[in-house]
Amino acid sequence: MFEPNMLLAAMNNADSNNHNYNHEDNNNEGFLRDDEFDSPNTKSGSENQEGGSGNDQDPLHPNKKKRYHRHTQLQIQEMEAFFKECPHPDDKQRKQLSRELNLEPLQVKFWFQNKRTQMKNHHERHENSHLRAENEKLRNDNLRYREALANASCPNCGGPTAIGEMSFDEHQLRLENARLREEIDRISAIAAKYVGKPVSNYPLMSPPPLPPRPLELAMGNIGGEAYGNNPNDLLKSITAPTESDKPVIIDLSVAAMEELMRMVQVDEPLWKSLVLDEEEYARTFPRGIGPRPAGYRSEASRESAVVIMNHVNIVEILMDVNQWSTIFAGMVSRAMTLAVLSTGVAGNYNGALQVMSAEFQVPSPLVPTRETYFARYCKQQGDGSWAVVDISLDSLQPNPPARCRRRASGCLIQELPNGYSKVTWVEHVEVDDRGVHNLYKHMVSTGHAFGAKRWVAILDRQCERLASVMATNISSGEVGVITNQEGRRSMLKLAERMVISFCAGVSASTAHTWTTLSGTGAEDVRVMTRKSVDDPGRPPGIVLSAATSFWIPVPPKRVFDFLRDENSRNEWDILSNGGVVQEMAHIANGRDTGNCVSLLRVNSANSSQSNMLILQESCTDPTASFVIYAPVDIVAMNIVLNGGDPDYVALLPSGFAILPDGNANSGAPGGDGGSLLTVAFQILVDSVPTAKLSLGSVATVNNLIACTVERIKASMSCETA
C-alpha cells in the first residue's frame, strides 16, 4: 500500500473526486455569468432569456442582442415555494411545474440552477463574514495575552519574570528537573533506611560517566535503584513520529519488505549453512538503515516451522500489540503502538503500517533487555501469502542511542490445508551486548537467546496451547482431566496471567518499579520489593522477590522433568514441608506431555496445617522450558473451575526458567549439553502495604532461594552420578 505509485494513485483519485464534486458549481457559475437576470441585481430571477441558457447561444452570432422574458410574480412565488420543499427537482417535477406555470422546462431548470447558486453565494458571504469576525476576535485576544505576559511581575520580589522569554522546551526541562530532584530525595531516604550510610558514599547514586548496567552490580554495593525510573530508558523517551517523518518511515518499510522477501526465499550465496554471509548481504542490500555502529555485533538467523493456526489469525496476532506481547511473553517484556500510519485495506491488514516500541528479554536477571523503536509493515504477497516485517527507526530518535537495531526482520506466512500455516522467520539485529553476564555470553552470541528459532518455537507452542483452549472433543476417560469447557478456559486464562507475571518479574526489564536492596549476602541473588495496592490479581501488601541464575551440567529435558514432577517436588520445595503432593486436575495443552496446566494439592505431614492448593503450568520447546506455580485459594479455584472470572484470583507466581547453554558437548555423557537455570520466588512478607520492610524478611527470602538452589543441585548430582 505504501509503494510510491500506489500513494500517487490515491492522490490522483482524491483530485478526481474533488473535480466531480465541483462540476455542477462550475456550470452554475457559467449560468450566472450568462443569465445575469437571475442575480440579486435583476429582481431575483424575475426575467429569463428566451431559448434557455447563454451557453446555448449561437456561436455564429456572438453579438446578437439577448432577448429576455420577465417571470410573473405568481410564477416566482410558486417556484420559490417549491424550492423551499425541494431545491433539486427531477425531470418529472420540472415538467409539471412548467405546465402549471406556462413556462418551458428549460426555463424552470435554469431558474432552479441559478437559485441554488444564489443561495450558495449568500451562505458563503455570511460564513466568510462570521469567520472574519472570529479571526479578529482571536487576534485581539492574542495581543492582549502577549501584553499581559510582557508586563507580568514576580509575586515574591515584584521584579519582571522570564515567562515570556522561556521556550516550551526549557519549561518542560525545568519541570523534569524538579521531578528528578524529588525522585532522588525519595530514593536517598529509602537507601538511608537500609544501609545506614550517606548516599554520597555510593558512587552509583550519582550520575556515572557511562550508562549503568544494573545487571553487573553487586548486591552489597548499592543502597537502592528504582527500576522503571531510569532516565536512560529508551522506550520512555520515544515519542510518536512527526508528519515529516512519515514519508521516511514509508520508504524504509517498503524497502524492508523487499529485503525480507529475499532473505526468506534466497539460499546460496546469501545464506551458507543457515549463517548469513555479511559481505554478500552488504552487496545485495546497499540501502537500509546505514552501517553497523562501532562496537555492535550482528546477529542473523532463519527458521521455518508448520504451526496449527490459520494464516489470518497469525497475522492478527502480529499486528495487535496486546496479543503479540501476550503470546510472546517469554520474549517481549513490554510493547506499545505509538502511531498507526495505515490500518490496511479491504477490511484486513494488507498494507497496515504501525510505529512501535518494544523491549525484548531473556528470563534471567543476568541478561540486559533489548529496547528498540521500529516500524511494522504487513503486506499480502502475489501468491496469497502474508509477510510482516520490522525495521528500526532509531535514526528518527537518536537520543538516547539504542543498544539494539532491527534490520529487516519478520516472517512469511503461507497458508496450508486444514488450518495449518508454514511460517518462515528471519531475525537480523545489530546489538551492543557487552552487558551480558559471562554465564550467558555463549548462549546470546550464538543466537539461541533472541534468534529466529526462539520466536518460531514460542509461536508453535502457543498455537498448540490456543488449539487446546478451543478444543471441544475432550476425552473424559483419563482421571483428573477437566472436561468443563468454561472451566478449562478460565483455568488456562489464570495460568496465562501467572506465566506473564513470572516472566515480567524475573527479567532485567526496566518497566517494573522494583527496588534493589543491599545487605542480602550472595552477589548472584537479586532481591527486589514493591508494594501491591488495589490490584485484584495480587494480594495486598509488601511483595518480596528473589531471583538467581546458575549453570548445571544436566540436559534441559531432565531438569524440566524433575522440576515439574509432583512426585519429586518434596526434594526441592521447602514450602511443601515434606508433605505428599498429589495432582488433582490437569489440562494438556500441547503434543509434548510436559505442556500442561495442573492443580496440585499438598497433604502436609503436620495434621494441624490446612491443605494447600498449587496452580502450576509447565511448558517446554526446543529453546526454553518453564515450570511456574503459585499457591491459590481453594474457594477461588472452585469458582474458576466452574467458569468464573479468573482475573480476581490473587497470585504471586514463583518458578523456574530452563534454557540450554548452547554447548551440545557439555554436561553429562550422552546428554544434550548443560542447562542455565533461573530460580525466582515472590513472597508476601507483610499484608499491610504501608508497613516497613524488615531486614529479617530479606534474609529469610535470600536463605529460601539459596537452600532451594542447593537442594536442586544435590538432587541433580545424585541423578547424574
Swiss-Prot record:
Write out the entry's keywords from A to Z.
Answer: Coiled coil, DNA-binding, Homeobox, Nucleus, Transcription, Transcription regulation
How is this protein named in the record?
A: Homeobox-leucine zipper protein HDG2
* Principal place of residence: nucleus
- Which species is this UniProt entry from? Arabidopsis thaliana
List each copy of the START domain by range.
242-468
**Where found, per UniProt?**
Nucleus
UniProt xrefs under SMART domains: HOX, START
Tissue-specificity statement: Expressed in hairless cell files of the hypocotyl epidermis. Expressed in shoot apical meristem (SAM) with higher levels in L1 cells and the epidermal layer of young leaves. Expressed in primary root tips, in the L1 of apical inflorescence meristems, early flower primordia, carpel epidermis, ovule primordia, nucellus, chalaze and seed coat.
Name the source's superkingdom: Eukaryota
Its biological function? Probable transcription factor. Involved, together with PDF2, in the regulation of flower organs development by promoting the expression of APETALA 3 (AP3) in the epidermis and internal cell layers of developing flowers.
List the InterPro entries: GLABRA2/ANL2/PDF2/ATML1-like, HD, Homeobox_CS, Homeodomain-like_sf, START-like_dom_sf, START_lipid-bd_dom
Quaternary organization: Interacts with AIL7/PLT7, ANT, BBM and AIL1.
Disordered: annotated segments: 17-70
Can you tell me which family this protein belongs to? Belongs to the HD-ZIP homeobox family. Class IV subfamily.
Q: Cellular component terms, GO, for this chain's entry?
A: nucleus
Pfam families linked to this entry = Homeodomain, START
Signal sequence interval, chain numbering: none
Compositional bias, Basic and acidic residues, is annotated for: 21-34
What outcome is recorded for mutants in which this gene has been deleted? The double mutant pdf2-1 hdg2-3 exhibits abnormal flowers with sepaloid petals and carpelloid stamens in association with a reduced expression of APETALA 3 (AP3) in the epidermis and internal cell layers of developing flowers.
Q: Name one GO molecular function term.
A: DNA-binding transcription factor activity
Q: DNA binding happens at which residues?
A: 64-123
Q: Which residues form a coiled coil?
A: 120-194
Q: Name one GO biological process term.
A: trichome morphogenesis
SUPFAM superfamilies in the record = Bet v1-like (SSF55961), Homeodomain-like (SSF46689)
